[in-house]
Amino acid sequence: MKYHKSFIVKGDYKNWKKHKFPFWAGEYTFSKAFGEWIEITSNIKNLYAKDLYKIHKKKHNYLQIDVRPKKEFEKFSLPQSVQCSGGELPCYINNKENLRKNYIVHCAGRTRSIIAYQTLKDFDFSNKKYVLNGGTQNWVLSGFNRKFENRSKIKSAKINYKDDFKLANSIAKKFKIPLTQIKSKNTNLYNFQIHSEIKNFKKITGWKQVNATTLIQSTDKFISSTNTKVLIFSNIPSSAVFTVIWLRRMGYQAIWQKSNARKIKKTYKLTKSDPTYFFPKRHLGNKSDSKGYLNWEHSLIPTIKKWGCKNPWVSANQKNLSKVQHSLHKIYKNF
């Protein structure tokens, strides 16, 4: 892998814990903690399951969006939900019909719905909006039934590429994110092509295809270096800008590859989903596991603060993302 220096920690993780150094436990913990941070530093408006149930019983103007990928939505979701993965929310909403609506976003738990809500703010959609607190897990904990065997209609969504490009440029300037149009031959970078569920675009050789929100909420499966440049390309410009904004908030050196994403000599192993070992029955209707998982998510930021890091990431309200630093540097400097 061309690393110049590598080391093995003597005594493995047990010795690490013995010295009371920071120690992660859980599932995609870094990304999950980041999601909790966004809720703390933004003005997230929560809607609770009982309130949503009441809304369902009357005529309303809410577009209720499950922001998970299509595959997850089709396993289970909520009554009245439509599906649009978080990275494609801006282009999905940016049309006359959907701009007349108000929005309720949800996932199975917390992280992706928090990201979706903040994204609606980032892209200047001023409509009334809410996060369903705790997602499908809290829905079940509140005594309501999920909807199974759903069929996503995301392929029927229409994209106005001119409007989307205009929106992407505007938001990129707003957050001062870096961009490039150079045909890079450098293979010592991370190259991601954002996978679209709305339209099948041609794969670019040497670029790893990944769902935008999956990349954000399970970053440790895709990016192992905290200071390597990360090029992001999408045939839907707003999806690329979405991804760059979120990666830079997390402290990664993400750059919008605005055009000229060329073929490169690079291969990847297939990224497989990990088995669910952590509160494994939380999506199977087990209330104890659902409650345990949601409580674990709430514990993440207090744990980081115990390590002496009061501001692990930038605030969700910060507009200037031209300079970023990974939170691991902020945490470890205290030890």
Predicted regions and their residues:
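Rhodanese-like catalytic fold shared by cysteine-dependent sulfurtransferases
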Residues: 1-63, 67-188, 195-335
